[in-house]
């Protein structure tokens, strides 16, 4: 494509719609995240049949993505600080396509596992960079729901994966299930090619004129000097950062505790056991056919999407903390009910397990699901935002890996009922953590949130001097 044609297309994206177009393309990284994590739930039934996998081998196939995602999260934040989120997301799109294609043609379990590790690398890069990109192009009054587009896209990707699983279940077409992700990867990469870097990254790199032009485009304001000065002032109040050791500084530590705590609790409350193993869970509950279990899983996925949309509309109205506390309370109740439903599994009562799963997923979708990704994109100082979010995402993926590697084994040793009771206890701990440690960020600019942490640090210093 000629430079003139590229410039014309970029110019066509000017105006009020530009920020929403940019957010939609960036959020495709979330859709691929959701698809590539969710698709294995239905495909695994047929992969096990073809390759004769043991329980441990099944856990490794599922968790290959999570190992790659952990590695991607480790490098993703620092890479964005150095090269910019847009460039990193372009590379991410290419890795998504390569990983999906390699998974679809894998001739053996080892090749499939390696291919899923590659896919996981892309997922880890997307999970660290898409929320930050969205938070930095969004206006403060709409940042909550725009960043929540990422989680919405994840849930849509999961539903698309479940529908694809159901479509190919009749022919046991697990290769088609895995290979379908190549198409959205191409769209994601094409969209990111035409999007700009974020103003904050550009100003940090000294590209002030480019940052001014980008802000004028995404804010539809002739005068964006006030916002530019606010970003500059935020940078001026910090020493050089962006290194891992900066995360241990006293003024950063409270935000780090919030981010890492939410990262771990989002996973140890068990949500991805439902995403990865839902058909197997439902077969344990009494569903006899693979197709029936997969179809019921689609219903769970639709609830996930619907409640994520509800969260998007409420997050900038009700605030982050109220949604978090109410949603986690719902998770505690539904996990308890789910544990009880597995005490007495039968075909007649199988739908009780489905209803409990839907209630659990609905509660997660208005709380830990979107709000974790939103908060870790908001709460960190600008200079370390990339590396800090990368660290939080790394903890998130490492926790996900541990939970997913142990779920089937826990069910074998303890039973499904006790396993879900265990996740319920973790949810109680997460509610207490949210109540005592998580601040409200609704309606604040990123610079105001940063100032809040500085003021809190100074107040603690003064208290310690008395």
What would you call each of these model-derived segments?
Residues 1-210, 214-216, 236-466:
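Alpha-helical transmembrane bundle of multi-pass membrane proteins
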Residues 217-227, 239-240:
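Short intracellular "coupling" helices and adjacent cytoplasmic loop segments at the cytosolic face
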Residues 224-235, 296:
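Short, well-structured alpha-helical segments
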């Amino acid at each position: 494509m000629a430079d003139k044609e590229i410039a014309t297309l970029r110019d066509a994206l000017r105006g009020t719609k530009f920020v929403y177009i940019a957010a939609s393309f960036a959020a495709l990284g979330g859709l691929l995240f959701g698809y590539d994590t969710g698709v294995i739930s239905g495909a695994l039934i047929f992969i096990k049949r073809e390759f004769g996998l043991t329980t441990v081998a099944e856990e490794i196939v599922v968790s290959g993505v999570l190992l790659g995602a952990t590695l991607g999260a480790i490098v993703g934040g620092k890479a964005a600080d150095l090269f910019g989120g847009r460039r990193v997301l372009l590379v991410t799109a290419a890795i998504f396509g390569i990983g999906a294609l390699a998974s679809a043609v894998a001739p053996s379990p080892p090749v499939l596992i390696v291919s899923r590790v590659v896919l996981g690398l892309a997922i880890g890069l997307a999970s660290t960079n898409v929320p930050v990109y969205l938070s930095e192009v969004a206006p403060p009054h709409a940042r909550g729901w725009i960043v929540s587009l990422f989680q919405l896209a994840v849930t849509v990707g999961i539903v698309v994966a479940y529908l694809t699983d159901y479509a190919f279940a009749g022919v046991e077409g697990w290769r088609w299930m895995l290979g379908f992700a190549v198409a959205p990867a191409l769209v994601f990469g094409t969209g990111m090619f035409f999007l700009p870097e974020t103003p904050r990254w550009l100003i940090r790199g000294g590209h002030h004129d480019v940052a001014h032009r980008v802000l004028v485009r995404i804010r539809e304001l002739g005068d964006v000097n006030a916002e530019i000065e606010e970003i500059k002032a935020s940078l001026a109040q910090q020493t050089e950062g962006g290194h891992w050791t900066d995360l241990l500084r006293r003024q950063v530590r409270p935000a780090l505790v919030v981010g890492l705590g939410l990262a771990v609790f989002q996973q140890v409350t068990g949500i991805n056991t439902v995403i990865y193993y839902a058909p197997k869970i439902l077969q344990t509950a009494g569903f006899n056919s693979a197709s029936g279990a997969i179809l019921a899983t689609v219903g769970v996925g639709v609830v996930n999407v619907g409640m994520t949309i509800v969260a998007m509309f409420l997050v900038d109205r009700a605030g982050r903390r109220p949604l978090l506390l109410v949603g986690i309370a719902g998770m505690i109740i539904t996990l308890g009910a789910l544990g009880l439903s597995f005490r007495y599994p039968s075909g007649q009562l199988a739908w009780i397990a489905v209803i409990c799963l839907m209630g659990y997923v609905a509660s997660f979708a208005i709380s830990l699901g979107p709000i974790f990704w939103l908060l870790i994109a908001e709460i960190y100082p600008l200079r370390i935002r990339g590396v800090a979010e990368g660290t939080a995402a790394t903890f998130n993926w490492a926790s996900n890996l541990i939970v997913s590697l142990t779920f089937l084994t826990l069910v074998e040793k303890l039973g499904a009922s006790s396993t879900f009771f265990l996740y319920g206890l973790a949810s109680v701990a997460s509610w207490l953590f949210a109540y005592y440690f998580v601040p409200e960020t609704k309606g604040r600019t990123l610079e105001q949130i940063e100032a809040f942490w500085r003021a809190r640090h100074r107040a603690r210093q003064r208290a310690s001097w008395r």
